[in-house]
Amino acid sequence: MGHFTEEDKATITSLWGKLNVEDAGGETLGRLLLVYPWTQRFFDSFGNLSSASAIMGNPKVKAHGKKVLTSLGDAVKNLDDLKGTFAQLSELHCDKLHVDPENFRLLGNVLVTVLAIHFGKEFTPEVQASWQKMVTGVASALSSRYH
């Protein structure tokens, strides 16, 4: 899953503290649903997902995106135990929701894109490397209970 250096931890925590979870969460999930339209099948109850404006303006997309990013806050606090942190969510997504674990990797990559957009020059290659390590670790942790 990758070892997080003290510098990685400081970089991740610092940027996380500046992030508007609600805005970034909605944008991240919205972009996932738009860029990878097959992921929409997991969100049948969200209503109209027929266009970019429908997806990005959908209150259920925004609310669930906030929920997803809020749970990512648990990762920021528990970088040394991502597998344990996400054990229950991994079981839920495997056994009940039947989500393809590849989607976790895609979501992480979309989040990195959103962070780059939101933070601009502050999102240096070093910051990106730390965040990429984290989202890869989270995707791996969320996939850990699949069988």
UniProtKB/Swiss-Prot annotation:
GO cellular component: blood microparticle; haptoglobin-hemoglobin complex; hemoglobin complex
Tissues where this protein is expressed: Red blood cells.
Modification Phosphoserine occurs at: S45, S51, S53, S140, S143, S144
S-nitrosocysteine PTM positions: C94
Positions bearing N6-acetyllysine: K60, K83
Molecular function in Gene Ontology: haptoglobin binding; heme binding; hemoglobin alpha binding; metal ion binding; organic acid binding; oxygen binding; oxygen carrier activity; peroxidase activity
List of residues binding heme b: H64, H93
Residue(s) carrying Phosphothreonine: T13
Keywords for the protein's UniProt record, in alphabetical order: Acetylation, Heme, Iron, Metal-binding, Oxygen transport, Phosphoprotein, S-nitrosylation, Transport
Pfam families reported in the protein's UniProt record: Globin
One GO-annotated biological process of the protein: hydrogen peroxide catabolic process
Keyword Metal-binding attached: yes
CDD domains documented for this protein: Hb-beta-like
Superkingdom classification of source: Eukaryota
Protein family according to the UniProt entry: Belongs to the globin family.
Subunit: Heterotetramer of two alpha chains and two gamma chains in fetal hemoglobin (Hb F).
Annotated function: Gamma chains make up the fetal hemoglobin F, in combination with alpha chains.
Protein name from the UniProt record: Hemoglobin subunit gamma-2
Annotated source species: Pongo pygmaeus
Biological classification of the source: Eukaryota, Metazoa, Chordata, Craniata, Vertebrata
